[in-house]
């Protein structure tokens, strides 16, 4: 095989390796985000109303329950 053929095959191999590595990183990030959402929503076993969930979702937070009839929103509900 000529030197040019070997260089082309090497280049194709490097491109393949680089793209598969990028895809793996993207897949890992997607899986990590999915796990974080699952954990965030299930930290506390509180019962919430649909109104509270919708109100807090608009603020990009989780409904942690009601206090004096008002929704309590937080990034992570503790206890």
Swiss-Prot record:
GO molecular function: ion channel inhibitor activity; toxin activity
PTM sites of type Leucine amide: 78
Keyword Disulfide bond: yes
Keyword terms: Amidation, Disulfide bond, Knottin, Neurotoxin, Secreted, Signal, Toxin
UniProt KW Disulfide bond keyword: yes
InterPro entries for the chain: Conotoxin (IPR004214)
The organism's place on the tree of life at top rank: Eukaryota
Signal sequence interval, chain numbering: 1-24
Cystine bridges: 52-64, 56-73, 63-77
Family label: Belongs to the conotoxin O3 superfamily.
Free-text note on domains in this protein's UniProt record: The presence of a 'disulfide through disulfide knot' structurally defines this protein as a knottin.
Protein name (record): Conotoxin TsMSGL-2
Organism: Conus tessulatus (Tessellate cone)
């Amino acid at each position: 095989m000529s030197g040019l053929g070997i260089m082309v095959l090497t280049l194709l191999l490097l491109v393949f390796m680089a793209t598969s590595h990028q895809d793996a990183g993207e897949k890992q990030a997607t899986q990590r985000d999915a796990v974080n959402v699952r954990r965030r929503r299930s930290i506390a076993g509180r019962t919430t109303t649909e109104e509270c969930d919708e109100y807090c979702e608009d603020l990009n937070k989780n409904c942690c329950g009601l206090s004096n009839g008002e929704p309590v929103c937080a990034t992570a509900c503790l206890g």
